[in-house]
Design a protein with these regions (language model features):
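N-terminal leader/auxiliary helical segments
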Residues: 1-83, 88-198
Length: 198
């Protein structure tokens, strides 16, 4: 996805996920959502499931279970959460998948169309997110398994910018809400850490 698409997505997530943490660190979350495209590794590491999913699952673990120092849950935390959305969104962008056989030029043309389609989809108010699944995650691994399951579903569907929009928005919404829910769960199960964060 293009940087502007990642910004549009991050703004949607900020506006539709009820989180004081995100609200207090909006800019960090938005910056995080474009950061992977600004790193030198962008040239050598493809943003696809095969090359980066293990890293993303590790990020998810650190954003939930391994967040021992709750005083640091702030700007850096939200920036890293934004990075997670970047990779997840790219996994559901057709040219970032092994089923795409087009050229770099076709990749760029597709992402340009996706930029406009995503903006239009977000503004349409026709977004359908299964928020009930968020509460089912009791471990970071369950969330990662869910991403794999939805990605397998995605690979079987017709690849259009419209289907990409639906998958990207719904999956990223569930993932961010799921990460924040897991964080809250682990904070509540560790009263000492929760008191330190207050």
């Amino acid at each position: 996805m293009r940087k502007k698409s990642h910004v549009s997505l991050s703004r949607y997530l900020l506006d539709h996920i009820d989180s004081e943490l995100l609200e207090n660190h909006r800019k960090a979350f938005i910056v995080g959502s474009v950061l992977p495209d600004c790193k030198p590794s962008f040239v050598t590491t493809k943003h696809n499931m095969e090359e980066t999913f293990d890293m993303v699952c590790e990020f998810i673990r650190k954003l939930t279970v391994n967040s021992d120092d709750y005083k640091k849950i702030s700007t850096a935390y939200c920036r890293k959460l934004g990075e997670v959305t970047h990779y997840l969104a790219d996994y559901f962008t057709f040219p970032h998948n092994c089923v795409f056989t087009g050229s770099i030029r076709e990749h760029c043309i597709y992402e340009k169309k996706l930029k406009f389609a995503l903006r239009s989809y977000i503004r349409s108010g026709e977004i359908n997110v299964n928020s009930t699944v968020v509460r089912r995650f009791t471990t970071p691994q369950q969330l990662c398994d869910y991403v794999i399951q939805i990605h397998q579903q995605y690979l079987k569907c017709n690849k259009t910018v419209e289907s990409d929009c639906r998958y990207i928005v719904a999956l990223c919404h569930v993932a961010v809400a799921g990460i924040l829910n897991l964080l809250e769960h682990y904070r509540n199960s560790n009263p000492v850490a929760a008191a330190a964060a207050a």
